[in-house]
């Protein structure tokens, strides 16, 4: 099964590749902006390019059955621009399954109905620009007919996978304050295998 991976050289992307590359069920191809010595992929499994460019997104997604995005916001509108390209190509190529990494800021507030966490005091972040960009992506996916999942980790320190953490649909697990990069990648791999959270944002924390 061919998987198109965008954001492979980021922290979660690299950790996911380390775990998933050994699974023979999946044939992973990654779009990368520059050669990256640490990626456990052969050169014929990587495409040099930029997720902001439609033609590069088309190239990596050719014949893919599942798309995974670990793209960050990059301080601009890269995330929403890339997602518009991804959705366009998925529709064109009849690809249904998309898993993407978001942020806990776009989960529902537990205490203020109708608001995202980043719009309330539940979020500790002072800057909301990145969360707004992630929210734009969520709104795009919500309006689509895709089988999507948005994984929404809270504070994301480096760390290896323990496999022990809490998940909750559309809200952050009560009292959750952090989740490691390794465990976020572990849950991404689990969701790839199980498809348990199709059509949901998933709050992720210890």
From Swiss-Prot:
<dbReference type="InterPro" id="IPR036291">
    <property type="entry name" value="NAD(P)-bd_dom_sf"/>
</dbReference>
<dbReference type="InterPro" id="IPR051606">
    <property type="entry name" value="Polyketide_Oxido-like"/>
</dbReference>
<dbReference type="GO" id="GO:0016646">
    <property type="term" value="F:oxidoreductase activity, acting on the CH-NH group of donors, NAD or NADP as acceptor"/>
</dbReference>
<protein>
    <recommendedName>
        <fullName>Uncharacterized protein YheG</fullName>
    </recommendedName>
</protein>
<dbReference type="InterPro" id="IPR016040">
    <property type="entry name" value="NAD(P)-bd_dom"/>
</dbReference>
<dbReference type="Pfam" id="PF13460">
    <property type="entry name" value="NAD_binding_10"/>
</dbReference>
